[in-house]
Amino acid sequence: MHRRLFIGAVLLLSGCSTIGITDLFQDYATQLRPVRQAVSQNNIASAQQLLPSNSRGHSNYLLNQLETARLEFLAKQNSQANETFEAVYQNMEKIRQAAKVQLSAGLEQTNSLLTNDSVIGYEPAAYEMTMLHSYKALSYVFDKQLESALVEVRRANKVQEDALKDNQAVLDEQAEKAAEGYPDMAELIGNVKNGFQNAFTFYLSGLLYEADKQFDDAYIDYKKALEINSENSYLQQTVL
């Protein structure tokens, strides 16, 4: 399964060798250029040393911790990586809950639910949360903990399902355009979904379900991955 996992990852993420949750934030991404260069040279130890150290009160603290966990994963420090990822996940859940309270109560701040004021208003994107769980699942795979890996892909898929619901209006709008004569509806819908869902994560969960002999669930997630990345020949061969 490891071989299929790596082949699929390369094909699905070609051109994205430095895929990281922090890529969505240009200012922080700029700071990470030396880190990425070290990673591209397969010098993970150097990358870990070059990673900026942000205090808990820094606005980029959680992003920094995500990158810390990713580098621990690349360094095959799986146990430590999972601890760091889990800590970030728990902090993100607090922030998401605080955001809901702010929205429903119209509050400017909810200090009791946040670890520090500087992160008020920051709600992690679905793509960030999805990749967090994907990295954790991969760490468990390499430690031969299939059940724990399945827990993480279920978490990831829950994030993706919620993102789909949140963006249903956009999908409906694009479907209407497709009905008016757009040449390739599958490609259009896939492009829209790619903005908030992740084909690789669906592919990963498909692999893990297949390894657990949950073949129907595996096929469903392979199809979801293909819907997002309809031109990927590897996914086409997997589904057909």
Label for each model-derived stretch:
Residues 16-37:
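Bacterial Sec signal peptide processing site at the extreme N-terminus
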Residues 25-26, 59, 126-127, 189, ...:
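Residue signature of alpha-solenoid helical repeat architecture, marking inter-repeat boundaries
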Residues 29, 33, 67, 71-74, ...:
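"A position-specific structural signal for the A-helix of alpha-solenoid helical repeats
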Residues 33-72:
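Post-signal-peptide N-terminal segment of Sec-exported extracytoplasmic proteins
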Residues 51-52, 85-86, 92, 153, ...:
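Inward-facing hydrophobic residues that define packing positions of alpha-helical scaffold repeats
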Residues 60-63, 91-104, 160-172, 226-240:
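Boundary/linker segments of alpha-helical solenoid repeat arrays
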